Design a protein with these regions (language model features):
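Terminal, non-globular segments
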Residues: 1-180
């Protein structure tokens, strides 16, 4: 004799049921351009801003909000290549393009799995993705291009902390651009 099966009290959530957001074309164009402008031009004047990676934060924001790996890759590639183009002659084209494409894919894939609206989750996501971003950037630069890059765990940890704190507030500001 078998016991009656207990009814499942949870819910099955399919990929289609997870809320994915859209953005106006103006937001899609202006938000990354402002982030890239700040990163490229204001960090030359305000050296302490150099620890922040605003384009990476924008890639993660759009990727987790859209929850589509293809759009995450495309967003990361475009923002990364624009960032590369403004990097100057000493910066090879494609390093940020590759890095931000990988981050865009990972963030959009993760956005389907977990709640990314929580500030604590956003903090952890940016902290981890900054470390991954730096690791991929170092791997591409050192491994493929044979650049003499220096790796410092303390610098990466402090940078990840600073980026995560700023990203929590930045994401709250960017939430205003979301459309269903």
């Amino acid at each position: 004799m078998t016991a009656p099966a207990m009814p499942f009290r949870g819910s099955y959530t399919s990929r289609e049921q997870v809320a994915a957001y859209e953005f106006s074309w103006l937001a899609i164009i202006l938000v990354p351009l402002v982030a890239i402008f700040i990163q490229a031009f204001l960090t030359a004047k305000l050296r302490w801003l150099a620890i922040l990676d605003l384009p990476m934060m924008v890639v993660v924001f759009f990727a987790v909000a859209r929850r589509n790996p293809i759009s995450g890759c495309i967003t990361g590639a475009i923002i990364g290549l624009l960032q590369d183009a403004l990097g100057g002659p000493a910066h090879p084209i494609g390093m940020y393009g590759i890095t931000d494409t990988i981050i865009g894919y990972m963030a959009s894939s993760l956005g389907v799995k977990i709640d990314v609206e929580n500030p604590g989750t956003r903090f952890l996501i940016i902290y981890v993705f900054f470390v991954v971003h730096q690791g991929v950037y170092y791997g591409v630069g050192h491994g493929l291009l044979r650049q003499s890059l220096q790796w410092s765990w303390s610098h990466v940890a402090i940078g990840a902390l600073a980026n995560a704190v700023v990203a929590v507030f930045l994401f709250q500001m960017l939430d205003r651009f979301k459309q269903r």
